[in-house]
Amino acid sequence: MRIAIEITYLVSSILFIFGIKFLGSPKTARKGNLYAAIGMFMAIAATLLDQEVLTYEWIIIGAIIGSAVGLILAYKTPMTGMPQMVGMLNGFGGGASTLVALAEYFRLNPNYPVDTGLPFNLPIDTGIAIVLSLLIGGVTFTGSMIAFGKLQGLVTGKVVKYPLQHPLNLILILVVLAGGVLILLDPTNIPLILIITAISLVLGVLLVLPIGGADMPVAISLLNSYSGLAGSTTGFVLGNNELIIAGALVGASGIILTNIMCKAMNRSLMNVVMGGWASAGTEGPAPDSKARKGTAKSIDAEELAMLLESVSSVVVVPGYGMAVGQAQHAVRDLMNVLEKKGINFRFAIHPVAGRMPGHMNVLLAEAQVPYDKMLSMEDINDDFPNTDVVIVIGANDVVNPAARHDQSSPIYGMPILNVDYAKTVIINKRSLNVGYAGIDNELFFYPNALMYFGDSKEAMSKLVHEIKAL
């Protein structure tokens, strides 16, 4: 039986690896998701068949409740709520790792729940794994819950700063590590293990609270990596090779994705790890219009429809405003009606647009937009000078030309979509208010830029109607 279980773990690990590989391409993402799901089912089945399982009653109850909650969330959560869902699931993974580490500590402790006076010979490797599981799992759980709250509007999406932010975070981490050393020296110290857990939970809040709502894609990616690392350390606690491999895969892929997104924002990974993300700017009201250079020109739906009648290429840049307005279906209708007129229609996706990695891709895919229409910043940037019209929907800082030349700007050096190089730029926003970097977007006042004010869904639907009426 033991050999069969280990073989099953090996096969499921291979499925996880291929699953992640296939998830790297939109065309094979469904296959990758299926492979990973099959691998997880096999891993769960092998674990339940392990001879160390003494009773199945609570396992069955937990599986039924968890499956029911998962199904309800899957069916009830709209695509626009995916960032919140991902954040919450990351938290559940971290919370599970924390609980498993605590449970294993108390299971191994001969003086719990009754002090027997027996020596507690906690193996060093197991003790280290337990402390790391508590630290990483605790940070992941509370950090992910704060991220969920920010995305859901339950917690302010603004940057929240507090005195001695970085030193305090560093001190708390060192306290946890020092406590871990003391646990190895005296494993019977139950209050200390609870203190380590509590500090880890507090640390998660303090690390994520300073992160602004617009920087959630990086935070979600990093927390996803943490959840994988927490799972991997829990695998060491339990001596489960499958959990070690699966957690390592998630942790490594999450770190790689986080690093890529940091480069896309011209920020350092260490700044994110220490909870200092978004320190360059804060949300706030629009500055006095007198400080702006020039005057923004506007266009209405009828005029824009007439403009689009005479072009041959259109690129749409989606942003968080499209997600908030749930305008992806209206944008797809715009694509369909313009392509019928022979217009080359594409999408330009910035790596950190939205509130989670791949947020815009998920929304557009849900609206049945073909994958080959979604181009990355690297693929589309050189083609903007040859583009007749760019329509920016709810994006702001990722198209601000100040990032290229204004060294005093908080977004200076951040790679952006060079939409200002196009012949005409249409910006759909509710107002001229600033983005999350807290600065004006000079693009709004460029001679080739026109503001198309209004809610994204309503504005795109009205535009489609006007085009059809021509």
Regions found by a protein language model. Give the residues of each.
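Membrane-interfacial segments at transmembrane helix termini in multi-pass membrane proteins
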Residues: L249-V311
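Cytoplasmic-side transmembrane-helix entry/capping segments in multi-pass membrane proteins
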Residues: R30-G39, I59-G62, G81-G93, V159-L170, ...
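Transmembrane alpha-helix boundary signature
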Residues: T47-I60, I72-P83, T98-G117, P187
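Structural signature of hydrophobic alpha-helical transmembrane segments
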Residues: M1-S13, D50-A68, T126-F141, P187-I199
